[in-house]
Design a protein with these regions (language model features):
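Catalytic-loop motifs flanking and including active-site residues across diverse enzymes
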Residues: 2, 34, 69-72, 130-133, ...
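Active-site-proximal alpha-helical segments within enzyme catalytic domains
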Residues: 125-148, 152-153, 157, 190-199
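Active-site-adjacent helix/loop patches that line small-molecule binding or acyl-intermediate pockets
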Residues: 15-114, 118-124, 137-140
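Surface-exposed charge patches
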Residues: 3, 40, 154
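Short, Gly/Ser/Thr-enriched beta-strand-loop segments that form substrate-interacting elements
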Residues: 119-120, 166-199
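Conserved active-site loop region of the serine DD-peptidase/beta-lactamase
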Residues: 139-182
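Active-site SXXK
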Residues: 1-11
Length: 199
């Protein structure tokens, strides 16, 4: 879902660096650091926090603390860069979401219309993928066959603390693997790993 943030030029336009890319890929713990990095993406893109459509976590004060606030901030930054509507960025027919689907279908070697639509807890469109398809996507990410995938891989490994959080599995595994393993937990108990350079 972070690919359009890079391919559109939105990430380079705001010079967000590896920290900005890492937070755009995160399922984080909602710390002050995470919220600050997500806010920074919005601020650099001249966007208001009120545009975020991810929920406010129970007991928290801001949508910036939601685990994928960085993804939503990157969605908005991309939409701003491409002059796409901001208020409807989570609609399945929004150009951003169509581009996300196109890129995923491309990596899977499928026509986009064969992808099965679903919706994430955060409100964002997502896809019902088979385990083998998830494995293939992470193999592409670890193999870094495309420039944008290499940027994402590098950013996650450079800032594992932003991808998840202190004491969390993804962060600790990426630290202890010394740049050899990418790790990202997802909803419903899914855990995806990829060996850097091999997939």
């Amino acid at each position: 879902q972070a690919l359009p943030f890079l391919s559109s030029g939105a990430a380079s336009a705001i010079d967000c660096g590896d920290r900005g890319i890492a937070i755009s890929c995160a399922s984080h713990s909602g710390s002050t650091t995470h919220a600050r990095e997500a806010f920074k993406l919005l601020w650099q893109s001249d966007l208001d926090v009120g545009l975020l459509q991810c929920p406010v976590p129970p007991g928290s004060e801001s949508a910036l603390q939601y685990n994928c606030s960085g993804k939503h901030a990157a969605f908005l930054a991309t939409s701003r860069k491409m002059s796409w509507p901001l208020e409807t960025y989570l609609q399945a027919d929004h150009p951003l979401q169509q581009e996300v689907n196109r890129r995923i279908a491309e990596l899977l070697g499928l026509p986009p219309d064969e992808l099965v639509a679903a919706r994430d807890d955060c409100g964002a469109p997502t896809l019902r993928l088979q385990l083998s398809q998830m494995a293939l996507l992470y193999a592409h990410l670890g193999g870094a066959e495309q420039a944008e995938l290499e940027q994402i891989s590098r950013a996650m490994l450079a800032h594992p603390e932003l991808v998840a959080g202190e004491g969390r599995f993804d962060t600790e595994l990426m630290r202890r693997s010394h740049g050899q393993v990418l790790s990202k937990g997802r909803a419903e108990g899914i855990q995806c790993l990829s060996r850097v350079g091999e997939g």
